[in-house]
Regions:
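A cross-kingdom feature that marks ATP-driven nucleic-acid transaction machinery
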Residues: 1-137
Length: 137
C-alpha cells in the first residue's frame, strides 16, 4: 500500500524542536522517527539494488508489515522496524502471520531494532534480529 516516507527524518526532528531528552521521554515519537530513519536507509539500499520498498497493510485483518523489500529477481523480504525489545515478540507474530498468509514465502524476514550490536537469527522462526548499526554499505 502507499505510505509516505520522510526524505530525512531529521527535518521533522528540527521542525518539532526535538532533543535527545525529549525523544527519550517520548518513546512513541522516538519510535516513529526511528522507523522513518530505517525506512529511509532501506529505500536507499533498494534503489541501489534496483528494487523497491513497499508497506503492507491487509485491509480486512488490519495486519501491517513496516517494509516489504522487492528485489529485481522477483524475490521479496518482510521487515518489521522496532525501536525497543518490548516490541520484538509482536513483530515476530506479525511476520509469521504474514508469511502464513502468502502464497509465495518471503526470501527472509527480519526485525530491525535500535538496541543491540549483534545480528541474531531466532532458531524457532528463522527471523533475523538486525541492529540499525548493521545498515551500512
Amino acid at each position: 500500500s502507499v505510505k509516505r516516507h520522510f526524505t530525512d527524518p531529521s527535518l521533522a526532528c528540527a521542525c518539532l524542536a526535538l532533543t535527545k531528552e525529549k525523544l527519550i521521554n517520548d518513546l512513541n515519537t522516538f519510535g516513529f522517527m526511528f522507523e522513518a530513519l530505517v525506512e529511509r536507509d532501506l529505500k536507499i539500499y533498494m534503489e541501489y539494488l534496483n528494487g523497491n520498498l513497499f508497506h503492507f497493510r491487509d485491509n480486512v485483518t488490519g495486519l501491517e508489515i513496516d517494509s516489504i523489500l522487492e528485489f529485481n529477481d522477483g524475490e521479496y523480504a518482510a521487515v518489521e522496524i522496532k525501536l525497543g525489545f518490548n516490541k520484538v515478540e509482536e513483530a515476530k507474530k506479525n511476520l509469521l502471520t504474514f508469511k502464513n498468509n502468502m502464497i509465495k514465502e518471503p526470501k527472509f524476514m527480519c526485525i530491525i531494532v535500535g538496541y543491540t550490536d549483534v545480528i541474531a537469527k531466532d532458531p524457532e522462526t528463522g527471523i533475523y534480529i538486525v541492529p540499525i548499526t548493521a545498515l551500512k554499505p
